[in-house]
Amino acid sequence: MMQDDTGIDRDTKSTKQDKKVKNWNTTILIVLIIVLIASMANLSIFIGGMQTLDNIKLRYEESTRTERIKHLIDEVDNLYNEYYTGELDYDKIEKMVINGYIIGAEDRYGMYLSGKDTTDYYNKINDRLVGIGVEVVYEDESLYVTDVYKDSPADNSGINVGDKIKSIENENVSELGLQGAVDKIKGEQGTRVNISLDNRDLTIERDLVTTSNIRYDIINDIGYIKIKCFTAGTDGLFKDIMNELQNKGIDKFIFDLRGNGGGLLDSVVETLDYLLPKGLIVRIEDRNGTITEFNSDRKYVEGEMVVIVNNETASAAELFTLALMDYNKATVIGTNTYGKGTSTTTIPLSIGSVNISTNLYYTKSGTNIEGVGIKPDIVLEYKSDVPLYRAKYSEDNQLQKALELLDK
């Protein structure tokens, strides 16, 4: 039997069928009326909702910016506590909210530090830490030791630069990743950690370690000083090393700042004061235009100097480099530096702390290198078959170039 698009048969229908159709039409009409009423109800609800949102928006616009942020966070928090099906990790939420604010402020160097992170930070800048006493780098899903602090638990256990750490507490480094592996190595003083190297397994007790961010050597009657970071003790140790070298008749120096991400302003200023003649070292300017100047005294070191830098040379290390260039005290070798021309301040919070970019800095020449960096006098890429941290002096072409310049 053929049907058209009405759904009604083309043949003659019986009276019973006609009644069914009438009943069906009546049902459709009732349903349509119900749907219409429901739609009107929904419309009323929606319009009422809009009126409520308008009121909220008006109150929102009248409040201060800080109040707005607090109000929105409270609203979201209440909604998630009422409706969210998952578990809330408030430690993580706190950190993400603060970091979200920093991202919104577009503070390139801003950072939130938890209570533990703050303690670790202050320990680091004061040349101490609790751990086993190694620095590591993550390569090819493994940890490689780049430095071992003297007399540390790692040093006493026979760990050497270049050693490969395969697992920590029976968990593979490849599965842990860099941060996970580092967190596993860290721990409370007096506790132990199990570490598997390529050729042996070790159980090491964590302890308070005095770190050193500076080391030195004499190569071909030239003083070589590697500065990894400008911490609270760097300037004093630097002066002691320089005095020792000069007492041995050394008057040519190489300062290796590759990988030096910066450090404390006071520390780098004191270090530069030892090297530079009387004059301006740096001036810093805050958001209100207030300027603070740091100057060197009349005493300074005479001699030839070379600074080696790379794209990881940043902040205080760039200030060190640029100040020596301004006074024509050093030749710079390497690749363009990072380009951090701001100083940050670590400010305590009720829980943890926050790093905020608070000043721009300018050297004697009036230069600020934010986003630009320093172009070396001699541009030279590092080229070697081995990573820099494992390279011998003879395998380091940038160091060899510095030695060549000073050996003339």
Say what each PLM segment does.
Residues 2-111, 141, 247:
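Terminal targeting/pro-maturation regions of precursor/exported proteins
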Residues 76, 97, 101, 134, ...:
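Terminal peptide-recognition signature
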Residues 80-144, 192-203, 211-216:
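Extended, small/polar residue-biased N-terminal targeting/export presequences
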Residues 127-168:
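Glycine-rich active-site/cofactor-binding loop and its immediate structural neighborhood
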Residues 139, 148-149, 168-169, 226-230, ...:
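Active-site-proximal beta-strand/loop segments in catalytic clefts of secreted hydrolases
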Residues 154-177, 253-256, 332:
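Conserved PDZ fold ligand-binding element
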Residues 169-251, 370-394, 398-400, 404:
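C-terminal, low-ordered peptide segments at domain boundaries
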Residues 202, 210-214, 240, 261-315, ...:
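Gly/Ser/Thr-rich loop/hinge elements
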